Regions:
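Elongated, amphipathic alpha-helical interaction scaffolds
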Residues: 1-243
């Protein structure tokens, strides 16, 4: 393989979770929000959070940052289905909310927006979602009017496993990013369709031959962990088909 897999923990964090590559994260997020929300700059924040309640539950985000307006973004890559995945994403969103409360000072409870972006390498099979779409926006709405009750908490679930466009079918920047997310490690060279400057940097950063020995070892360990998870899922699915 010439390029890293962005589905691995190492690959995802290298491209989207490091300060030198914040322009890649900004471009990617802007493609997801498609003009609805424009991000000009981001500042990376501590991705490890410890709860302040009895259990002291810990949350470690893949990428945690804030934009120039102080709005918070949690960006997660999820390769395997979890029974309580929706509850987990809701739980994670509480950390950026609670940390906005100043300690030992009066506060009027005004919150900055918190966005959770979950990239799912599986079909969530969520009844509330349009089955023909893969990019889903979830928020706090009035059930009767469907009007926004509060816009400070937003969830974006992107089912990248259901993205099947070929190189010839890539029209938008959003299409191109999803194609790269899903297929980068399978490519031998940069496709002609990915002509934008941002992808020039992406392919340079993703080239395995440029890694230090330490980086290579970290990537190989991360790749093994990803493949172990993938094999476990494939085995379970195959067993289910045989029994079903």
């Amino acid at each position: 393989e010439r390029y890293i897999s962005l589905l691995t923990d190492f690959g995802f964090k290298r491209i989207f979770g490091t300060k030198p590559n914040k322009d890649l994260l900004i471009n990617f997020l802007n493609s997801l929000f498609d003009g609805f929300h424009v991000i000009k700059d981001v500042k990376y924040l501590n991705s490890e959070h410890v709860g302040d309640v009895f259990a002291e539950r810990k949350a470690i985000f893949d990428v945690y940052c804030e934009n120039e307006r102080g709005e918070k973004f949690i960006v997660e890559m999820q390769n395997a289905y979890q029974k309580y995945f929706k509850d987990r994403s809701l739980f994670y969103s509480t950390f950026p909310i609670r940390e906005q409360a100043p300690k030992g000072a009066e506060w009027n409870f005004k919150l900055e927006h918190v966005y959770t972006v979950a990239l799912l390498n599986f079909d969530l099979e969520e009844e509330a979602f349009d089955k023909n779409d893969i990019n889903h926006d979830v928020g706090l709405l009035d059930k009767k009017t469907f009007k926004v009750f509060n816009d400070k908490l937003s969830f974006k679930y992107v089912e990248i496993a259901k993205f099947n466009k070929t190189e010839e079918e890539l029209d938008t920047l959003y299409d191109k990013w999803l194609y790269v997310l899903k297929n980068l490690s399978r490519l031998d060279e940069r496709p002609a369709a990915l002509k934008e400057k941002v992808f020039t940097k992406l392919f340079e950063e993703a080239e395995i031959a440029k890694f230090t020995p330490t980086e290579l070892k970290e990537y190989e360990d991360s790749l093994k962990a990803y493949r172990d998870v993938k094999n476990s899922i494939d085995t379970a699915l195959e067993k289910g088909r045989e029994e079903g």
